[in-house]
């Protein structure tokens, strides 16, 4: 009996020793694993806490234009820019011991495990704020052991490398609050239409309850349930002595008013402008569209919301709703190149294709001011005379000819001045000028004005047969308005990252690239399209809208069978309109042919309403005299016609009109400039000049 007892005792002691040994070994192994994890975490250092954030675009007045979010609305804000109650409420309901543990709340974990065992189900969570933050940053929300291991590993790394406030700030900026809102700032805007720092304490307490289950605790889904959870949170704050009982009662009783959910989904403002701003961002920052849309950038654009609204409303009010005709519109500040308003089509939802910046259309006669700028620079003056008559131009020695015509087949059948030729849009005068200068000159001049299209040096180029982008034509006119300084259409003035660091700022430096005197004289002549005193064999091209205008503008219209243009400016604003059909169908309706001019005139008047009149100021080297616009003579005593016209100093007309009938002009009177020898033979034949 004793032998059996001793044997059992020895066996029991061996078993106990074995368990002690195995327990000690397991403890050492666990400690070794734990220390290894700690050391690896320490070696790897701070994990990245970068998360996708919404990029916001602002209008020139600082108001919000739009945002990009890739489906996740997220705006990072520091703790100091949150109502303190959101912090207290979140800690109270999610992790009471947050400031005391090192990432894991072991007591809470044990309690949760015991509760789960009793219920034979997962009934209580034990994840700390740090664990949830790690899960939000790095992990998928599956329930595998691998995910649990990685969560623990990232939790350790976060606790090792970031302060409690940094972890809490990150958590509050990444947790999901429902309806696409990630982070407390997005949630504040979504539910209450305000910034997180402006939340009331009651609103903050309600929001703190949503992340546990956005599909159940969102007030949009179940307001009663959301209020019940808010009450639970407030009482927990009271229990943890974060607030008094009186304060708790007040918060529970406070009525809450929510933003209507349907207001959160709205049409993007100025969508065509928005797309151009995004394209410019890609170019300026060297980033992909996805990088831009998820980097939390603050993009300050150039759009003037008032002018944008005027442009959109003017187009809608002018164009017949039943017509399929399209419109491209842009307005530019000549002083900076800033695009103030842009419309790329009549309905962005139906067609996001931008007819202002992406399409190329024949500019027609709107190209003529660029030609005449070069002519003035080359010795022409506003009173240079050339005959307007039906003309067949011999292009080369092979006998090829070019026979342009004037609108409706009207001709003066006598010499007219450059001033009048521009106001009446005489095509014969334009082609003669183009050929006299050399067809390559207009190609080079267009490049100086910022035209990027490849233009062919054809005789017809003077009449705008080579397609260009409408916005580049408006920009070219803006360069005439600013006296010849180089500008480019600009959509973005400044970009900062989420922390406020400047990533890009438009330098706003503009080099003088055009002849200032020639640019001013050209701009001055362009005011003639609205001046009925310049009527001749036909009316000035702006006669139909002259009575709509209350200011001095310079401008030029243009027409092809499929395109209708109007571009014009004053010193502060340049704007242009193109109308036509996407498939190049002809514009047959008289009403549709008038759209471009009407839209331009009404926009300019409304956009500048309340602004002081700004005069075109001549630069040094330019002088003004009164002339007879038909003969080109200076207006002396007794001369009936008097039109104030600017000239490059020294090129004013020598002849004077005294009222008597002047000698009839029958030949072209061109600058006494020697032409290239290659042009002399055919030019002399039709020009009637002899050497």
Curated annotation (Swiss-Prot):
Pathway where it operates: Cell wall biogenesis; peptidoglycan biosynthesis
Reactions accelerated catalytically: [GlcNAc-(1->4)-Mur2Ac(oyl-L-Ala-gamma-D-Glu-L-Lys-D-Ala-D-Ala)](n)-di-trans,octa-cis-undecaprenyl diphosphate + beta-D-GlcNAc-(1->4)-Mur2Ac(oyl-L-Ala-gamma-D-Glu-L-Lys-D-Ala-D-Ala)-di-trans,octa-cis-undecaprenyl diphosphate = [GlcNAc-(1->4)-Mur2Ac(oyl-L-Ala-gamma-D-Glu-L-Lys-D-Ala-D-Ala)](n+1)-di-trans,octa-cis-undecaprenyl diphosphate + di-trans,octa-cis-undecaprenyl diphosphate + H(+); Preferential cleavage: (Ac)2-L-Lys-D-Ala-|-D-Ala. Also transpeptidation of peptidyl-alanyl moieties that are N-acyl substituents of D-alanine
Membrane-protein topology: Single-pass membrane protein
GO biological process terms, semicolon-separated: cell wall organization; peptidoglycan biosynthetic process; proteolysis; regulation of cell shape
Residue intervals annotated with topology Extracellular: 41-691
GO cellular component: outer membrane-bounded periplasmic space; plasma membrane
Primary location: membrane
SUPFAM superfamilies membership: beta-lactamase/transpeptidase-like, Lysozyme-like
Pfam families: Transgly, Transpeptidase
Enzyme Commission numbers on file: 2.4.99.28, 3.4.16.4
Region (Disordered): 663-691
Molecular functions per Gene Ontology: penicillin binding; peptidoglycan glycosyltransferase activity; serine-type D-Ala-D-Ala carboxypeptidase activity
InterPro entries documented for this protein: Beta-lactam/transpept-like, Glyco_trans_51, Glycosyltr_51/Transpeptidase, Lysozyme-like_dom_sf, PBP_transglycosylase, PCN-bd_Tpept
Topological domains, Cytoplasmic: 1-19
Localization of this protein: Cell membrane
Chain intervals for the UniProt region annotation (Transpeptidase): 327-605
Residues spanning the membrane: 20-40
Gene3D superfamilies xref list: Biosynthetic peptidoglycan transglycosylase-like, DD-peptidase/beta-lactamase superfamily
Keyword Transmembrane assigned: yes
Keywords tagged on the record: Carboxypeptidase, Cell membrane, Cell shape, Cell wall biogenesis/degradation, Glycosyltransferase, Hydrolase, Membrane, Multifunctional enzyme, Peptidoglycan synthesis, Protease, Signal-anchor, Transferase, Transmembrane, Transmembrane helix
Transglycosylase: annotated segments: 55-223
Protein family (similarity comment): In the N-terminal section; belongs to the glycosyltransferase 51 family. In the C-terminal section; belongs to the transpeptidase family.
NCBIfam families, alphabetized: PBP_1a_fam (TIGR02074)
Function: Involved in the polymerization and cross-linking of spore peptidoglycan. May be required for synthesis of the spore germ cell wall, the first layer of peptidoglycan synthesized on the surface of the inner forespore membrane.
Protein's UniProt name: Penicillin-binding protein 2D
Organism, as annotated: Bacillus subtilis (strain 168)
Gene transcribed to yield this protein: pbpG
